[in-house]
Structure formats: C-alpha cells, structure tokens
A protein has these predicted regions:
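Active-site hotspot residues in diverse enzymes, especially metal/ion-binding acidic/histidine motifs
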Residues: 1-402
C-alpha cells in the first residue's frame, strides 16, 4: 500500500485543471510563487497548513495532494477548434480535464462493456501533402467520398442524422461537454491510449450554442479523428498547416451532415430563399448559414447569390442568433448510462463509486466529476439510505397490552 505523502505533480495537475497560473495561486493562498514552484517540482514539502490553503484555493480535497496517481493514461494529441484565439492555459486546462475523463472511463470499463472504436480505414492524400495550396474542388470531392464511406459504414443512409451524439458513442467515440468559461474554444478531440486500446474523446462547449452549431462541432472533430494524423504534436506544425486541417475538418462536417446526394437535391427547389432554408433547418438540424455555404460549395448558387444571402442574414441579425436557436445541452451520454446501470443493478452505490474513484487517485468533489462527465446534477452526491437496524418484536398473544 502506498503511503500518504505530498506529491508535487498532483498540485500542478490540480492548478492547471483550474486554469490557474503560479501567480494566481500565490495570490489566492498567500504562498510565494517560488515556494509553489518548489512544491510542484518536489524540491520542497509544504507544511500541512499550506496544503489546506492550496486545497481551499483549488477546490480539491486535501487527500488529493497526498495520493499517488494510480490510473495511468497516455494522451497522444489534442485537436482544439479555434486554436488561434485560445491561450495555452485554456488548452492545457481542458486537455487535463479530458485526461481525467479518460481515467474515469478506464475505471468504469472494468465493469461496463463500452462499444469498441468502429471506424473505416480511409486514404486521405491531402492530409499527407507537403503543399498547403489545395484545389478546393478536388479536396471537396475527396472529402465528400470519405463522408459517404463513413455513412455507409455506419449504415445511417444519406438523410438527416438524428441523434449524432448517440451514433458517435455507439461507434466507440466518447462524447462529453463542459463549460470552458472561454469563447476561445468551441470543441476539441483527444486521442488517449488506455490499457484496453486507443480511445477518442470529443468535448464540446455546451449550454451556450444552439443544436446546429453543436452538431457541426461534433462533426468537425469527427473529421479530425477520421482523416488527420494523431501521431504528432500540434505544437510542431505551423499555422498554415493547422489552418488547412481546420478547413478540411469543416469541409468534412459540411459534407457529412449535408450530403450531396440528398441535401444537394432538396435545396435546389428554392436555393435563394431564406424562408426555405429556415424550413430545411428544422429537418437537417444544421444552421442556415452552414446550409447556404454548402449550397455554394455544391455550385447550386453563384458567388453573387451567396454574398447576397449572407448580407440578408446579417441584415436580419441572424449572424449570432438564427430563428429557433436556443442554448443546447448534450443528451444523457454514455457515462450517465453506465453509472445509472451500475447503481440500478446494485453493483455499486453513488458513495461506492466515489470510493472507487478515490482508490485510483480521482479524489475530487462529486460536482467536479459530474461536470466532467456531463452527468445529472447530484447523481454522485446522493446518500445511500440506511437500512433500519431495529424493529418491533412480534408478540405471541395478539391482545397483549403494553
């Protein structure tokens, strides 16, 4: 059994989890920045009262800093959408949060048979090209073919996709969402190596954007998973290549959600009518602006028509909020289903799950884990009802008086 001792790596992990700098933590605790740096690098051991100050500032249980990290995962690459406007701390914080999601996934996989990753093998030549100048038509045709291949592989036809989150999870891609507290990050995907193989996670910034944009974000990240390399750090690629990959992922999302074979035919009826796009939005669950761009991409409308429609969108104030838009939250995800199953089958209680997580070093407050996994509020903090330990005696004589 590992003894309890302060571990600097755990302090750094908790600090970055909260998106806090050394200076910020120093200000919140009254401990010097130099001392905190020494703590994180295990070059000095803090007094217990300082651990308590750190615990309160970072909102982590004191026990967290005295534990060994028993659940090891290896994160390969994280693709962030809107990377250019996100700070390094934004990206690091969200990446660490998703690492904890991966650890919890691995713990639960000891009890739950999660779907295996189910993706076709595709050849995407442009992703391996040394040239960043891409012929749009050729690129679009290639990605159109890949999205069609995936739809056929998953047997979802060429019509509107219903519950995209369910389809992703059914095919082994884990979806979660939490508040990034920043508009700089729309969504991100992460490749993690676990004991039971490779797993891809997608996280979206929910509760701010409408359903159409969330679905586009999910499809965008799916594009990264399917067509882009995951064996290199994004810090090593230049801005031009990153922009190209973002463009390719956007194009994949567009072709995947709005296939040429079906949407392309339907939109031709009234391709310059905003009222018609408003109707199509209810069916395809994609934003009006994305559908207009797709029509232009398919040469159904001219550049002049595209520009005119977008000016009309701006004039109506639809750039930021289209008709029918309201903040969208993910449906109950695979983690919610897994935890409900364990509790309903009396495999483990809510309190038992928290003990299990602590056993593997995931010592957090229930609310943090609920937020990480997009769970119903309170599912991990409900108390197990105690079984009565006393009861009335059964009297032999029915009429015996007290």
């Amino acid at each position: 059994m590992d003894k309890s001792e302060f571990r600097g790596t755990r302090l750094k992990s908790a600090r970055l989890f909260r998106g806090m700098t050394l200076t910020g933590l120093s200000s919140a605790t009254g401990i010097s920045k130099q001392s905190i740096s020494l703590y994180e690098n295990d070059k000095n051991k803090p007094e217990f009262d300082n651990i308590q100050k750190i615990s309160n500032a970072l909102m982590f249980p004191t026990e967290f800093f005295l534990q060994k990290d028993s659940c090891k995962t290896s994160t390969e690459v994280t693709y962030f959408r809107s990377l250019a406007s996100a700070t390094k701390m934004d990206r690091t914080s969200q990446s660490i949060k998703l690492e904890y999601v991966a650890k919890i996934y691995e713990i639960l996989s000891n009890y739950i048979d999660f779907p295996s990753l189910n993706l076709p093998t595709v050849d995407f030549t442009d992703s391996l090209s040394d040239s960043f100048e891409v012929n749009n038509e050729l690129l679009c045709n290639e990605i159109e073919s890949i999205s069609s291949t995936l739809r056929n592989y998953w047997d979802i036809g060429d019509g509107p996709i219903g519950n995209l989150q369910f389809i992703l999870e059914k095919n082994g891609i884990i979806v979660t969402g939490f508040d990034t507290n920043e508009n700089a990050i729309d969504a991100f995907s992460q490749h993690t190596v676990l004991n039971n193989g490779d797993v891809f996670f997608i996280s979206v910034d929910q509760g701010k954007k409408p359903e159409g944009r969330i679905r586009f974000d999910l499809s965008h990240e799916l594009g990264h998973i399917l067509i882009h390399p995951w064996s290199e750090s994004l810090d090593l690629i230049d801005k031009d290549e990153f922009k190209l990959r973002e463009k390719q992922a956007n194009m994949f999302a567009s072709t995947f959600l709005l296939p040429k074979s079906s949407f392309g035919k339907e939109v031709q009826a009234y391709p310059t009518s905003l009222q018609y796009y408003e109707m199509l939005k209810k069916k395809w669950k994609v934003s009006i602006q994305a559908m207009i761009y797709r029509s232009y991409q398919l040469n159904i409308i001219t550049n002049n028509q595209f520009q005119y429609l977008m000016r009309q969108v701006s004039k109506k104030g639809w750039r930021q909020k289209e008709p029918g838009d309201k903040p969208y939250f993910l449906n109950a995800n695979i983690f919610q289903g897994a935890i409900e199953l364990l509790i309903e089958e009396k495999i483990v209680s809510s309190e038992g799950l928290m003990r299990l997580f602590r056993k593997y070093g995931i010592t957090m407050f229930p609310k943090d884990i609920e937020d990480l996994l997009s769970l119903k509020k309170g599912i991990l903090s409900s108390k197990t009802e105690l079984t009565p330990i006393i009861q009335l005696k059964r009297y032999q004589e029915k009429n015996e008086a007290l």
